[in-house]
């Protein structure tokens, strides 16, 4: 083994140089680490995952499966065959909104709203505690209501109004006639509801307050033209989708094709709730099921 006296002067110089290099490397490493820590501290606020504001569905178990609710501003398609509970989901969503102070636009093409009120009461939800305004009413409300109802009669009224406001066609000398179940009639009715609720600034189409929009069901608007479902869905979303509007859109499920009646709504929706039941003739009982097929910006339950 070599002793210190065996090391030559040249070797000592080399060792000193190596030590200096190591010290320099340590200094550089420390400087880089300090810079990294400073940068991390400086940019940490910008690297955080943005907080998603969530809207309660009105069903605690479903909220839990959705990390607290659906993202605010989402459009949720609710699909399923008759009798699976689609309308009941809508009632819970509306009720949660009323309790939270959110105004509600409730479009119902499947039943009269008075029947919705009766059914909701069976589940402990009394909509008549709140001010309800039917858009088919000829009288303007004295104060903004909590719920604006748009049923087939309201749609007929809006269709008549926009038909009368249309200019004459120069070739046919006739006006375009809008039907109650025309998608443009629905869009006009929704915007009229926003005005009645008092949530629009003058000249704006975007509500300044969060609104819950329920359409039960959209299938009625393309019942005679299911191939147009995607086009109509896009038209509705372009015209009515706003950051301050969270929507439930019901679509009937065709038993023959095992898919939604009209292709396209699920594609434009941010989330899809699907409901179904076992074949009652085979099972001899009613067994209903529910699954979250998709929900953007949400790590939702998968079963």
Spans of features found by a protein language model:
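Interdomain "pre-motor" coupling segment immediately N-terminal to P-loop NTPase/helicase cores
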Residues: 2-40
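Conserved P-loop NTPase
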Residues: 20, 30-33, 37, 53, ...
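N-terminal pre-Walker A segment at the start of P-loop NTPase domains
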Residues: 41-61
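Walker A/P-loop NTP-binding active-site region of P-loop NTPases
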Residues: 65-147
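Loop/turn-to-beta-strand initiation segments
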Residues: 103, 146, 208-212, 242-250
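Conserved nucleotide-binding/hydrolysis micro-motifs of P-loop NTPases
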Residues: 110-114, 122, 153-158, 219-220, ...
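Phosphate-binding/switch loop-helix module in NTP-utilizing enzymes
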Residues: 150-241
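Phosphate-binding/switch region of NTP-binding enzymes
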Residues: 246, 250-303
């Amino acid at each position: 083994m070599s002793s210190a006296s065996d090391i030559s002067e040249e070797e000592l110089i080399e060792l000193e140089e190596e030590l200096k290099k190591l010290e320099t490397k340590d200094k550089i490493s420390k400087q880089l680490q300090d810079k990294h820590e400073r940068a991390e501290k400086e940019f940490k606020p910008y690297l955080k995952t943005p907080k998603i504001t969530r809207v309660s569905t009105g069903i605690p178990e479903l909220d839990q499966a959705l990390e607290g609710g659906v993202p605010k501003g989402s459009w949720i398609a609710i699909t399923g065959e008759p009798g699976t509970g689609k309308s009941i989901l809508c009632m819970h969503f509306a009720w949660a909104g009323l309790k939270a102070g959110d105004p509600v636009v409730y479009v119902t093409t499947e039943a009269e709203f008075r029947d919705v009120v009766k059914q909701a009461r069976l589940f402990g939800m009394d909509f008549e505690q709140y001010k309800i305004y039917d858009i088919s009413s000829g009288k303007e409300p004295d104060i903004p209501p909590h719920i604006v109802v748009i049923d087939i009669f309201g749609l007929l009224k809006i269709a008549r109004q926009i038909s009368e406001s249309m200019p004459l066609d120069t070739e046919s000398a006739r006006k375009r006639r809008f039907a109650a179940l025309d998608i443009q009639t629905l869009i006009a009715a929704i915007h009229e509801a926003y005005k009645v609720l008092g949530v629009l600034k003058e000249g704006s189409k975007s509500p300044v307050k969060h609104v819950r929009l329920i359409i039960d069901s959209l299938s009625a608007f393309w019942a005679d033209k299911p191939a147009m479902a995607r086009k109509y869905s896009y038209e509705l979303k372009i015209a009515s989708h706003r950051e301050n509007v969270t929507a439930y859109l019901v679509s009937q499920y065709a038993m023959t094709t095992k898919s939604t009646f009209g292709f396209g709504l699920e594609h434009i929706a941010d989330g899809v709730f699907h409901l179904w039941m076992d074949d009652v003739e085979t099972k001899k009982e009613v067994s209903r099921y529910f699954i979250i097929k998709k929900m953007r910006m949400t790590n939702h339950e998968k079963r």
